[in-house]
Amino acid sequence: MSNPSCIIIAITGASASGKSSISSTVHKELCNELGCQEIGIITEDSYYKDQSHLEMTERVKTNYDHPSSMDRDLLIQHLKNLKNGSAVDVPVYSYVEHTRTNETTHFTPKRIVILEGILLLTDERVRQLADISVFVDTPLDICFIRRLQRDMEERGRSLQSVIDQYRATVRPMFLQFIEPSKQYADIVIPRGGKNRIAINMLKAQILHLLNQK
């Protein structure tokens, strides 16, 4: 079944910049306007590479902020399938086991697909498939505080482990890969999920594209 009206919205930015908040807000509000069957969210995190062949001591060394950690070929294939009107089975990744689980999430074609992740715009193929590219531009100190709270409260991590990871990979990879990808964004949103005007503009552009299909 062809699905020529499928629109892909790529939302990227630093870890804890507010990407998920914006994605959820847009999803919820367009659900109310168009119906939830018309819109869905896919997270880039689901496409971290399968590491089941590695020992745990090797898995924990993964630099999750580097493009090489992603199974980008699978993501691209899934995006193309959705553009063509085909359903996909999205992997489920376990941060506890540092690899994919045996489960998948069945994702049916939608008129609007929100794709959310830190490294999306570093890949030219993703940029070409995205109809709208968004960069959430939040100061790094704010991102770090949010990440610290999230990882300690929701993932049971220690203060020192979060600080060590931030120094070793999160900040360096942001400066090397993520921040430079901002140049490819169609829309740059400062202040993250609290920027109501920018969210309204994004929604308006999505609806405009839908009407053109």
Curated annotation (Swiss-Prot):
CDD domains: UMPK (cd02023). Pathway: Pyrimidine metabolism; CTP biosynthesis via salvage pathway; CTP from cytidine: step 1/3; Pyrimidine metabolism; UMP biosynthesis via salvage pathway; UMP from uridine: step 1/1. Its EC number is 2.7.1.48. Its main location: cytoplasm. GO terms for molecular function: ATP binding; cytidine kinase activity; uridine kinase activity. Keywords: ATP-binding, Cytoplasm, Kinase, Nucleotide-binding, Transferase. It catalyses: uridine + ATP = UMP + ADP + H(+); cytidine + ATP = CMP + ADP + H(+). The keyword Transmembrane does not apply. InterPro entries: P-loop_NTPase, PRK/URK, Uridine_kinase, Uridine_kinase-like. One of its GO terms (biological process) is UMP salvage. The keyword Protease does not apply. ATP binds at G13, A14, S15, A16, S17, G18, K19, S20. SUPFAM superfamilies: P-loop containing nucleoside triphosphate hydrolases. One of its GO terms (cellular component) is cytoplasm. It is found in: Cytoplasm. It comes from the Bacteria. Belongs to the uridine kinase family. This is Uridine kinase. It comes from Haemophilus influenzae (strain PittEE). The gene is udk.
